[in-house]
Amino acid sequence: MAKGIREKIKLVSSAGTGHYYTTTKNKRTKPEKLELKKFDPVVRQHVIYKEAKIK
């Protein structure tokens, strides 16, 4: 069975709360770092989440 091209990534909150989301990303079509505006339930606001590696 072939390996998938998509890799797991972690989106970490820029608010410094430690909250994160996990998702997958196609490294071949999107080599740049991902930045999304998502809801942070700790501060109860929409903040920017930046891509980080899953350890």
From Swiss-Prot:
Key words of the record: Ribonucleoprotein, Ribosomal protein
GO biological process: translation
Cellular component GO terms, alphabetical: cytosolic large ribosomal subunit
A molecular-function term among this protein's GO annotations: structural constituent of ribosome
InterPro entries listed in its UniProt record: Ribosomal_bL33 (IPR001705), Ribosomal_bL33_CS (IPR018264), Ribosomal_bL33_sf (IPR038584), Ribosomal_zn-bd (IPR011332)
Matches recorded under PROSITE patterns: RIBOSOMAL_L33
Taxonomy, superkingdom: Bacteria
Pfam families, alphabetized: Ribosomal_L33 (PF00471)
Annotated family: Belongs to the bacterial ribosomal protein bL33 family.
Identification of the protein by name: Large ribosomal subunit protein bL33
Source organism (scientific name): Edwardsiella ictaluri (strain 93-146)
